[in-house]
Amino acid sequence: MAHLPSVTADGESVLFISDESGLPLPWAVPGRGGTASPLWSGSERVGSIHASPTGPEAIISVDAGGNEHWQLARLDLGERGKSVHPLTSDPQVIHVPGKWAKEGGRYIYASNARDRRFFDIHELSLGAPHASRVLLTGDATHDVVDVAPGRLLVARANTNLDIDLLLVEGDRTVHLNPHPGEVTVQAAAFGVDGVYAAANPDRELAGLLRYRPGSTRHEFVREFAGELELIRPSPVSSSLLLSVNRQGWSEVHLFDPSTGEDRVFNSGPKGVVESVSWYPDGSAFAYGISSVGGLQLYRRDVQTGKEKRLAGPASTPKPVSPPMIRQFLAEDRVAIPYWEYPPGGPARGTLVWVHGGPESQARPGFAPALEFLVGEGWRVIAPNVRGSTGYGRTFTHLDDVRLRMNSVRDLRDLAHELIRQKKAEPGRIGIVGGSYGGFMVLSAISTYPDLWGAAVDIVGIANLVTFLERTGPWRRRLREAEYGSLDTDREFLASISPLTHSDAIETPLLVIHGKNDPRVPLHEAEQIVTTLKGRGRKVDLLVFEDEGHGLVRRENRVIAWERASEWLERELATPHA
């Protein structure tokens, strides 16, 4: 895995995160290609790396045991050797990585130090001694979007799908996008002639908007055949590097708003572009792409359009073919897209893989557990049930609150479609999902138990009430907007929780969880396992002491995925319906 590229100030190196050692840590590779080398050998994962715009240093974020309580540190890349110097040290506080000030010496980030429920914007001075001051506060979740001399662009989340864009200039804060209803801002950045945003006011999918200096009225600049999700202005011109989500695949554009010229880079690997970093002279950019087989880094020359691979896995033990996009009609005639991953030979069986979120999307990027199962001979089907993103705001809201179980019904209809296609048999379909996808797994086997022969729940929700009560306080408000409020919807939330209907579960269930999960606490796994064991059901629990919301350590992944494959193979050998 190699991702999150950050080009150094001199353009001579690209810093990135790699799990080559078995744990995500900072690495570097020569800017024009060469041998990659580690920068630090810590014992905890590094979540991000941002190269200084002026000198040989970077800011990294580190947590402990997967708890997501990120601490910031300065990584010295000078000639005397590489060393790490902590900048924050409160393990109870989350420090969300942000952006360097353009002149260097200052780093802007978000933190919930004042109140664990909310994130304020802070400025950290890297002089000695290190000093931090608050730039923006309020009872909301704020995130750093972009930084320019004397200006700061901040996103304020009302919900995960309703974002206020704030322009901060000294003591003055301007709400750039006042709007009725809901507007999702996928990305934003300072351009040469204003602020550019990927947003969806009065439309289904996000397009390119511009806010001229001194104005809070947007101009709609460009619409794409998909959803705009990334904006990176050139450091030397008016051009914008853009990434568009087209039915899950990323399409990279170099668009100049001043002329309307739009170049599409069609060559190179196909997948999901997850991050981009310009070289300082604007001649090239480094990008991380997630595709079947791994996360890789490439350098693309702007003039020639040619790409060069910088880092990432050269090959995989059991290569997996790219998935095919298909769709079926649900009972109410809603079109449900899904990806089909074919095994290399005759299928051992069919598995349904449910993504998390729910405001997310199954895409043809790197999915290590899914690809492991495909490599083991399973046909894997990854649906985008109603409520998924990437298909417009109407589709995304089809599972809100009281509509929640309609998305579970989509899994039933998908199973029937697979049976109709003779790709599965009733009672012999496996179902796997993580996080919210784990909730969907538990809901599917408790609502339609006759369809599923085996299930794997990874860091999933068993009870929406206890989940909302125990999830990190910074998450509850945003999660209630999607699921329903404990104050007004408690009875309903309990009524649709899988734990409430656990007496209907007959499907053998493997539950995998991290002890330090701050999003979906371990209690969710423990209560469904305890309840099912008390009823004499076939259930097992695998807990990792040094993991959080998902598995990041390679040795843990190997244990978990091999265990899951063995569980599925054994339980799907004969039908349980």
Language-model features, listed with the residues they occupy:
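Peripheral, non-catalytic segments that deliver or gate enzyme domains
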Residues: 1-346, 358-376, 403, 417-420
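Conserved beta-strand scaffold positions in the cores of enzyme catalytic domains, especially
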Residues: 36, 325, 380-382, 541-543
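A fold-wide structural signal in alpha/beta-hydrolase
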Residues: 350, 374-384, 540
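The conserved beta1-alpha1 loop
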Residues: 354-356, 513
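Local beta-strand N-terminus motif with an aromatic residue
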Residues: 348-349, 452
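Conserved beta-strand elements of the Class I
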Residues: 15, 350-352, 510
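Active-site-proximal cap/loop segments of hydrolase catalytic domains
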Residues: 385-577
